[in-house]
Swiss-Prot record:
Species assigned in the record: Influenza B virus (strain B/Beijing/1/1987)
Extracellular side: 16-553
Name this protein carries in UniProt: Hemagglutinin
A Gene Ontology molecular function term of the record: host cell surface receptor binding
Quaternary assembly: Homotrimer of disulfide-linked HA1-HA2.
Length: 585
């Protein structure tokens, strides 16, 4: 008879593990967020730069005005604005102008009292217009003005092109023509008509002359202080002349003068008439400036060398490389970065994670259980992706679609910040346009406060953008997990935390196909589990029946068991000194 001995052999298979993950980096950067404070990320986009000082330049794509009249040699801008005889020329059109004469300058003609009027602003006012031209004819007939007849006074200090006596083209020095009208007079009024083309601003220059008592009597027949008033567009200005007390002064090599002139201007809007009320010594308006358009004005220096994106009062000409800058805040024109108080960086990657580690612990029958933490090294083609662990080692593959979605979100945030930049620039530009007539009197504290407010708005926008970029990682990983689960199907078991245990091997090729979305579980063979192997052992039949065989086996086994028990008992008793054993030969 044959006896059957059953031998069991089970073949097991080590499954691979696939997980979704995020790239790691060996050089983390730090960005600021709204609620998480400083966060380490794998990459950043610097949004700020700190400029260095450079020379001033022309603005790219824009006509930039340095001197009002570049062809008027040896002339200050004030000479040009007043119409000094040897400083008559064309002022080129420009959308940007450099205020290069910071300190009040002399006229280079007759001594002017700068401290009593805003005359030093006249060149700056003209710079604020894109198009400027001097009228071809006079706005008033000075000889027949009220209080006349007058003769137009000239001075050897104001030589004309033939080196004869002259005077400013914008004003007529109204001196009584004969002794009969060299007398004191009550205030007289003259209307100043609008003679420019419709839509242009008319800048009308006027003034008055005063001297010591002797000269006042000689010229005007009255040594008392004279009263003057101008009015245009609801703005009225009053003056009372000063008699005497002036030292002799020569301008630009001219003759010494004991008298002074006070010069002012008024801006007449399209179609509006102005008025001037005066007594003796009036400088009546003659040629007027007709101006239109806006030219942005900034303090700077000449010459203008080359071209730049931006002109900055502190740094000169700049090329814009970043949307914002840190350093000294000052006015700037052109395509300029916006000033912010601190450096800003936009997250351009994922939240930093150290390289992933596989933490292992022993389970039943030595089975290895593990879980992953950190980010994956080697994910060079993207930020999000997959990793597998198994006999092949570690394989990593990036998911390009998920990474592109993350990049698109960052680009959207960057564009939003750019839109915020444009809005703030428009706001600043509007404020500057409203105040361009008073550019030298702008309150720096107000300007700094406005800059601080805008800086805070921008910083908050960057913090919120970084917050959104970092928080969106969970969305991308969840989407990857759903995508992975769908592709693996029944060939894997979801073990949580974005990981799946597969019923097949998944090497680099397998993982690359998962990342590319072309994975097919059927292409990777499932491991086979061998069924129970049963081997039958045949025993020779020597005439012994089964009962006899079993009797022999049981007797031998029982005898062996009893013998072992006795031997163990004797050894135990000897060790306890309860039994002694003597051996004699």
């Amino acid at each position: 008879m044959k006896a059957i001995i059953v031998l069991l052999m089970v073949v097991t298979s080590n499954a691979d593990r696939i997980c979704t993950g995020i790239t790691s980096s060996n050089s983390p950067h730090v960005v600021k967020t709204a609620t998480q404070g400083e966060v380490n990320v794998t990459g950043v986009i610097p949004l700020t730069t700190t400029p260095t000082k450079s020379h001033f330049a022309n603005l790219k794509g824009t006509k930039t005005r340095g001197k009002l009249c570049p062809k008027c040699l040896n002339c200050t801008d004030l000479d040009v604005a007043l119409g000094r005889p040897k400083c008559m020329g064309t002022i080129p059109s420009a959308k940007a102008s450099i205020l290069h004469e910071v300190k009040p300058v002399t006229s280079g003609c007759f001594p002017i009292m700068h401290d009593r009027t805003k005359i030093r602003q006249l060149p700056n006012l003209l710079r604020g217009y894109e198009h400027i031209r001097l009228s071809t004819h006079n706005v008033i007939n000075a000889e027949t003005a009220p209080g006349g007849p007058y003769k137009v006074g000239t001075s050897g200090s104001c030589p004309n092109v033939t080196n004869g006596n002259g005077f400013f083209a914008t004003m007529a020095w109204a001196v009584p023509k004969n002794d009969n009208n060299k007398t004191a007079t009550n205030p007289l009024t003259v209307e100043v008509p609008y003679i420019c083309t419709e839509g242009e601003d008319q800048i009308t220059v006027w003034g008055f002359h005063s001297d010591n008592e002797a000269q006042m009597v000689k010229l005007y027949g009255d040594s008392k202080p004279q009263k003057f008033t101008s009015s245009a567009n609801g703005v009225t200005t009053h003056y009372v002349s000063q008699i005497g007390g002036f030292p002799n002064q020569a301008e630009d090599g001219g003759l010494p003068q004991s008298g002074r002139i006070v010069v002012d201007y008024m801006v007449q809007k399209s179609g509006k008439t102005g008025t001037i009320t005066y007594q003796r010594g009036i400088l009546l308006p003659q040629k007027v400036w007709c101006a239109s358009g806006r030219s942005k004005v900034i303090k700077g220096s000449l010459p203008l060398i080359g071209e730049r994106d931006c002109l900055h009062e502190k740094y000169g000409g700049l090329n814009k490389s970043k949307p914002y800058y840190t350093g000294e805040h000052a006015k700037a024109i052109g395509n300029c970065p916006i000033w912010v108080k601190t450096p800003l960086k936009l997250a351009n990657g994922t939240k930093y994670r150290p390289p992933a580690k596989l933490l292992k612990e022993r389970g039943f029958f030595g089975a290895i259980a593990g879980f992953l933490e950190g980010g994956w090294e080697g994910m060079i083609a993207g930020w999000h992706g997959y990793t597998s662990h198994g006999a092949h080692g570690v394989a990593v593959a990036a998911d390009l679609k998920s990474t592109q979605e993350a990049i698109n979100k960052i680009t959207k945030n960057l564009n939003s910040l750019s839109e915020l930049e444009v809005k703030n620039l428009q706001r600043l530009s509007g404020a500057m346009d409203e105040l361009h007539n008073e550019i030298l009197e702008l309150d720096e504290k107000v300007d700094d406060l406005r800059a601080d407010t805008i800086s805070s708005q921008i910083e908050l926008a960057v913090l919120l953008s970084n917050e959104g970029i970092i928080n969106s990682e969970d969305e991308h990983l969840l989407a990857l997990e759903r995508k992975l689960k769908k592709m693996l199907g029944p060939s894997a078991v979801d073990i949580g935390n974005g990981c799946f245990e597969t019923k097949h091997k998944c090497n680099q090729t397998c993982l690359d196909r998962i990342a590319a979305g072309t994975f097919n579980a059927g292409e990777f063979s499932l491991p086979t589990f061998d069924s129970l192997n049963i081997t039958a052992a045949s025993l020779n039949d020597d005439g012994l029946d089964n009962h006899t065989i079993l009797l022999y086996y049981s007797t031998a086994a029982s005898s062996l068991a009893v013998t072992l028990m006795i031997a163990i008992f004797i050894v135990y008793m000897v060790s306890r000194d309860n039994v002694s054993c003597s051996i004699c030969l």
